[in-house]
Amino acid sequence: MFRDTEFPLSSGTFTMPQSESTPHNDDFDDVFGSEPGSPTLDGRDMRDGDMFGVGNTEISDIPRLKEKHETEGYRDGVTKGKSESVQKGFDEGYGLGAVLGLRIGKIIGILEGISGAVSVSASKSEGEEWTKEKSRVEELSNNAKNELKTEKVFAREWWGEDGIWKFEVPGEKEGKDVVFPDVAAAHPLLKKWEGIVEEEIQKWSLDMDLMEGNEEDVVLVGQHVKADAVEQRIGAAKTDLNW
């Protein structure tokens, strides 16, 4: 029989030879490369409508389209609202603006007329009285033009953002019907200058009925033509303005 022969082990550590690593060929990975793992049916994303249980990894266009539609809808609403509001505001403010414009034009027109007449008299007279009156009336006319500018008449001091006047109109607190001429007459600037103009009218003894053309039997000197006939001939028939 053979005996097991015990071979003495050397005192040194026995080291196994390491095998050299074989380089991996990647030349065909683009053709035979590994594919992603198969989807698993774990039921987590079935509520999202994915039959394989895998959520949609692409960003959905729904939020972007929703935001776009909301923005376009907002713009369309603002555009439509502006067109309706602007037209409505214009219709409501046109009447009052027209009355204010007529009264302001009358104030400036009378002062310019007085200034022109005084200037002619001052040029024909050598007295200092007419020269002083000329300077006074010219200054008065210039001040009226400055204070009755559009931006000052419609300043925030007199009007609110909604277009309602801030100044007191007679009869408004009592519940009486207030019309545009009442509002225009109560405007502080117009009230001031209409008072000044009235003083000038009294000072120079002006006939306002004659200046406003209310005489029915006005005859042109040398022509004997009535004013009504002239108006019809030039196509400017006089009409009453009811505000």
From Swiss-Prot:
InterPro entries according to UniProt: Essential_protein_Yae1_N, Yae1-like
Polar residues compositional bias, start-end: 8-22
One Gene Ontology term from the biological process aspect of the record: protein maturation
Domain of life: Eukaryota
UniProt-annotated stretches for the region Disordered: 1-49
Major subcellular site: cytoplasm
Keywords: Cytoplasm, Nucleus
GO CC annotations on file: cytoplasm; nucleus
Cytoplasm among keywords: yes
Quaternary structure and partners: May form a complex with LTO1.
Family: Belongs to the YAE1 family.
Function recorded in the entry: The complex LTO1:YAE1 may function as a target specific adapter that probably recruits apo-RPLI1 to the cytosolic iron-sulfur protein assembly (CIA) complex machinery. May be required for biogenesis of the large ribosomal subunit and initiation of translation.
Listed name of the protein: Protein yae1
Source species: Botryotinia fuckeliana (strain B05.10)
Underlying gene: yae1
